[in-house]
Amino acid sequence: MAAIAAVAARRRRSWLSLVLAYLGVCLGITLAVDRSNFKTCDESSFCKRQRSIRPGLSPYRALLDTLQLGPDALTVHLIHEVTKVLLVLELQGLQKNMTRIRIDELEPRRPRYRVPDVLVADPPTARLSVSGRDDNSVELTVAEGPYKIILTAQPFRLDLLEDRSLLLSVNARGLMAFEHQRAPRVPQESKDPAEGNGAQPEATPGDGDKPEETQEKAEKDEPGAWEETFKTHSDSKPYGPTSVGLDFSLPGMEHVYGIPEHADSLRLKVTEGGEPYRLYNLDVFQYELNNPMALYGSVPVLLAHSFHRDLGIFWLNAAETWVDISSNTAGKTLFGKMLDYLQGSGETPQTDIRWMSESGIIDVFLMLGPSVFDVFRQYASLTGTQALPPLFSLGYHQSRWNYRDEADVLEVDQGFDDHNMPCDVIWLDIEHADGKRYFTWDPTRFPQPLNMLEHLASKRRKLVAIVDPHIKVDSGYRVHEELRNHGLYVKTRDGSDYEGWCWPGSASYPDFTNPRMRAWWSNMFSFDNYEGSAPNLYVWNDMNEPSVFNGPEVTMLKDAVHYGGWEHRDIHNIYGLYVHMATADGLIQRSGGIERPFVLSRAFFSGSQRFGAVWTGDNTAEWDHLKISIPMCLSLALVGLSFCGADVGGFFKNPEPELLVRWYQMGAYQPFFRAHAHLDTGRREPWLLASQYQDAIRDALFQRYSLLPFWYTLFYQAHKEGFPVMRPLWVQYPEDMSTFSIEDQFMLGDALLIHPVSDAGAHGVQVYLPGQEEVWYDIQSYQKHHGPQTLYLPVTLSSIPVFQRGGTIVPRWMRVRRSSDCMKDDPITLFVALSPQGTAQGELFLDDGHTFNYQTRHEFLLRRFSFSGSTLVSSSADPKGHLETPIWIERVVIMGAGKPAAVVLQTKGSPESRLSFQHDPETSVLILRKPGVSVASDWSIHLR
């Protein structure tokens, strides 16, 4: 017993030292990230091997005599001219202007991982036909669209053309590399294979290959091929080197975006001579800005933009991935490019992209646009659209690590009412649970969680509690016992349950790649299983990269084993998506499939948009972190993840009051709006600041809540079409080169342009208003400005430049109450901003704000408002929808209007009625008072 007690004491000390070390990093707020904890490309052996291959003639040749053309795909064998290993290329034309390329081993020693559960369905194909052929190439025509694919045999290459214009080339630089599986080397002096240096995999069909000497030379094992060590961690690599890589050349393209998550510029940078962009979900403490290091999530989607074309590349691989970017115009200034143009330079701009992944197959979708909105639709057709969030989740969220107890929560709740500040959600971090045992409540601090939740519900507010995917190893903890007994944990390579260190101390990690595990997890959110939960409790998934304090790079060992025998290296980047998926499914199931979920996740992958919101992780209370939140969320929006935000105020350190105010002002115009703070920071609820800062924050909150109908409509459009809510300016103005690198301002939909104030002590900002023959109206003063131009605008502590584009109509709620649920039946005010042609258009989506009835019962309204010829018309934009609602039109504000002699309202079946109005000749603003018509009815208002 004494020995057992001593071991237990050592384990407690070990756990404490690890947690203190973790906290030391978090609390050592003068320190930046310790880069030595995270690999560079040179320290990642497969990246180093892949990157050592230089451009040249590819060693791969297509064997055209093996070409087979079926109804859905073309297949052809590829051979490596040195190793003689055969691969199989599967090429598919897809509907909606897409092409899919898959390359795998023809006869693998064991199957290679193919990423499941990301695509919403098998994409419908467009038939390929052979339209030309010679000894070294085949020309293929895609049945849908004016596209051709040229397959060149030697060296292997693919070219995609529209008519005679080259859109994209594959393997044009000869950088394709596919590390085939092989038997580990056996030293000559050893006669027993078990005595070899590498781990011996199980015998599988295909064993017994006898490579020729040329093959052996080509397959010479480099350091890290069969075993790799990083710091104190060893990766056994029982299946040897299995990396894949491929290059893509984009002629005519200079501007590329996407592949989040990185704390870097919106426009991706050239990586030659530096580090590639890394995609490997990691818990990075106090991440640095303006570098390509990996962060919490990975979306392997890249967008390329030019004046005349947009393209997308979706690299479907869940393993560690690096992306190299090169350009033949890198280093040239805008003046230099203009000079080339004026002098008739024949050099076509080109960007080259190189993808490198540690395992899996090559599986890539080429999305051919031609417009960026086409690319958005194409990607959404593959991986799904942004889930329609419940209305409350678009309101303001108040969080910190941690609110102490029930009394603290209720005091914060009351504080918002006492200071006339709206709030929808209060959050609880890890301290709310009993000893970090998730699905429980601390019996001392939160003895009556149902009473607390009921009190919040009476205020029409919600609570979010954290549920992380690491489970305390404790024989008295029901969650752990069930997972262990059902064999649902991730395993070590020897078959035991994997254990690592995280917040609870020793923890095991549920294997979310297992459908049984996901079903079990979802069931845990039922009200019977999650004691103390209620319908107004929602969930936050943190640490789901997964974070392992004592693991390599603060994550799981790559040779850990998942469902189906797959290694963690194969599935790493999809783990967080599975956690998000299972949690969202659990919240849906607990309501019998009626209620929409809200789940925030830190880790993500392609497809995560279907399950909820994400955020930019543990940022810092510094002005540069405020600035970087814009390109970080814009990059996510471009690849489908619209529901993004950054911790308002910064997670680490204490923000000065001015910074906190500016962060609220920016957060009010970002999709996910949550203030959050570290355990060691001072309390920063808005009413704790001096009155002038309180007033500025209150104004920001009011702006957010008044725009909720607009936000909700934008999210419905994102849900239906796949269009981003928060957009770079270039998305709306694809031919305006001035917008291509702008990342300090952005648009919401096509209507609002926002330029946050992100410099300390700023008295003004430079705002670029794009668009030939566009007009922009300041939403506060209604002053009209013409585009394109750059304006210097003075700002005060309480102001932030926001403009409404002429030609748009924005619906608003003007009666701000304590929460969104208190406002959902309030009347609407329409803000009509007229274009120079005197026209405008906008939409309004309404439903009950929280159920799936808009889908299952068509209980919704989608209204279209159009202004033309001095008439404002309301009509249904989707006749399938129907909704009984008390909401009516309270007011119409028309910017850019002259004074009419009369204003007349017409509704079906009713006589004309005159409306009272007020006109300001200085601002050209016309206000129509109380039309009094139902938002659900058809009507028209005529200015005479």
From Swiss-Prot:
EC number: 3.2.1.207
pH dependence per the UniProt record: Optimum pH is 6.5 - 7.
Active site (record annotation): 542 (nucleophile), 618 (proton donor)
GO cellular component: endoplasmic reticulum; glucosidase II complex; Golgi apparatus; melanosome
Outcome after substituting residue 542 to E/N: Loss of enzyme activity
UniProt entry tagged with the keyword Glycoprotein: yes
Disordered, as annotated region: 180-238
Keyword terms of this UniProt record: Disulfide bond, Endoplasmic reticulum, Glycoprotein, Glycosidase, Golgi apparatus, Hydrolase, Phosphoprotein, Signal
Glycosylation sites: 97
Compartments, as annotated in UniProt: Endoplasmic reticulum; Golgi apparatus; Melanosome
Effect of residue 618 to N: Loss of enzyme activity
Sites of Phosphoserine modification: 52
Pathway(s) of this molecule: Glycan metabolism; N-glycan metabolism
GO molecular function, one term: Glc2Man9GlcNAc2 oligosaccharide glucosidase activity
Gene Ontology biological process: carbohydrate metabolic process; N-glycan processing
Binding residue positions for substrate: 283, 429, 602, 676
Family to which this protein belongs: Belongs to the glycosyl hydrolase 31 family.
Protein name: Neutral alpha-glucosidase AB
Organism this protein belongs to: Mus musculus
Name of encoding gene: Ganab
